[in-house]
Amino acid sequence: MRAKSILFIFIALFTLHIDAQFQQGRDYQRISSVIPIKKDGKVEVIEAFWYGCGACFSFEPTLNRWKSSLDNDTKFSKLPVAWGPIHQLHAKLFYTIEALNLGNNGHSAVFNAIHKEGNYLTSDNAIVDFLGSLGVEEADVLKQMNSFSVKQKVKRSIELSKKLKVNGVPMMFVDGTFKVQAQRNHNDMLDIINYLIKIQKPNS
């Protein structure tokens, strides 16, 4: 019994230590929710990003490994920021890739093209050529790029980028309640997100 009591105290103290590591105002901020959150028992995590962002590029492999570890009670999505013309063009590229079901391979190819090959994808024609190099027919690319659905999603990205006051990327949001800005260490950022997921689960 004594050993069990000591173990319980140790676990409790360890948990308190972990929780004390993260402080509101220093490691994360509480925000006024501008994202409609569906209370379906799942915690919603959003990453605001831009393909042209070097920090987002270096974060991507760590983020993908983290995503694969998420349980069914957490859902993750990306929000391509749409501050100006080039960001809006890349947001259109993001949603076109989604519509073409190219998935993570497509997104990784974009990051590599920009940051490793110097192909900055600054026009519709450049995007058509790039997606063609991935084996997608030009007609299919143009159909999705110019679709009502993709245009509406880009419009939503513009609105959310403003409402969420995204002033740097990568930036992450948990349940439309907490904001976490980029950290020096990618794992530190995800440790904070894991902490916020844990405290949000009872409220989802």
Which residues fall in each region the model found?
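Short histidine/acidic/glycine/proline-rich micro-motifs that form metal-
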Residues: G52-G54, P80-G84, I114-E117, F148, ...
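Extracytoplasmic/secreted envelope proteins and their assembly/folding machinery
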Residues: E60-K67, H90-F94, H107, D124, ...
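C-terminal cap of thioredoxin/glutaredoxin-like
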Residues: S133-S204
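Sec/Tat-exported extracytoplasmic proteins
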Residues: G52, K67-L70, I97-N101, I114-G118, ...
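Structural microenvironment flanking redox-active thiols in thiol-disulfide oxidoreductases
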Residues: N72-L100, N104-G132
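Alpha-helix N-cap/helix-start motif
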Residues: C56, I86-H87, Y120-S123, V154, ...
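Extracytoplasmic thiol/disulfide redox context detector
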Residues: R2-P85, K155-I158, K162-K163, Y195-S204
